[in-house]
A protein has these predicted regions:
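Short terminal alpha-helical segments
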Residues: 1-31, 82, 86
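Amphipathic alpha-helical interaction modules
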Residues: 15-62
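Amphipathic alpha-helical binding modules
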Residues: 53-94
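A ubiquitous, low-specificity "background" feature that marks scattered single residues
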Residues: 14, 31, 35, 39, ...
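Compositionally biased amphipathic helical and low-complexity segments enriched in hydrophobic
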Residues: 5, 12, 20-22, 42, ...
């Protein structure tokens, strides 16, 4: 999978969970952050400074690690992509 595919997978899972639990604000927060990461991956000219403030990984662990491991894994992978992109490093995911 490409870095963009990891972000798209996380976005799809978040959208699916948001439909099942409408009104759960955490999904809106995650969607906004994932869309920003996606935009940065698609347009290298965008400001990357906000990538250092991404909280996708901590939300994954706090909110979903125990209750929804599939979503938690996708969010952790997306967080890794964001961090590595923000640092300008190569992204190595399985």
């Amino acid at each position: 999978m490409t870095p963009l595919e990891y972000i798209d997978r996380a976005l799809a899972l978040v959208a699916q969970r948001a439909l099942a639990l409408p009104g759960h604000d955490v999904f809106q927060h995650l969607t906004q952050q994932l869309q920003y990461v996606r935009a940065v991956l698609l347009d290298r000219g965008l400001d990357r400074s906000r990538l250092h403030q991404i909280t996708i990984g901590s939300v994954a662990v706090k909110e979903f690690d125990e209750t929804d491991p599939e979503l938690a894994r996708a969010l952790k992978d997306a967080h890794y992509v964001a961090v590595q992109t923000g640092r300008g490093l190569k992204i190595d995911l399985p």
